[in-house]
Amino acid sequence: GDWNKVMQEWDDFTLESYMTFTKSWLSEAQRILKPTGSMWIFGTYHNIGVINVMCQMLGIEIINEVIWYKKNAFPNLAGRRLTASHETILWCNKGGKKREYYFDYEYSKSGDFSYDGLKAPGKQMRTVWDISNNKEKCELEYGKHPTQKPIRILKRMIKLASREGDIMLTPFSGSGSECVAAKIMGRKYIGIELDNSYCEIAINRLAHVDETEEQFGQLHLELFESAVAK
């Protein structure tokens, strides 16, 4: 299936070519990022080390390393290693002497995180997030991507690091989950994706965001939202 395709494409990278690729897109992300903005980067043990090192080489500051714990992780069918049950998320800013990036600290303490098994109400948010990887039916209605992220985690990240009306760029948008979350949250969005089939899925999802929002029980836009297809 698609996951096998993803792994095949990963195997086609040499370490040198992956480092070159990573430097290329990170440099551009750093160039266009406003001093008041920040970026979130998902990764696994396959690539997060290279991304971390490249951020340091480019002068990109890593604000936090977040561990997304998945208690419902996919089982290890081969039985040859431990079951992977987390992803790493790097939260980064442009770098430099001034730290101007936006952070909604009050939301991080007092927002509604009832879906997170570790977040204590009214307490500072920590760097381990216990959030199910299950997707709602409305998230899969128009198709799916092998590394598709649940809307609930994306909305959290968007709210923590941006204001309503801000512009969000997703350079590897897949089936458009980040764009959908951004639109729900009232942000402007730009999404980039090479695969035409995923672009079509993203376009369909974005066209039905009102239905998605209603199914999530979010009929008002007071907490989070923006990202795009083409």
Named regions from a protein language model:
Residues 1-200:
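Core catalytic lobe of class I
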Residues 203-230:
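S-adenosyl-L-methionine
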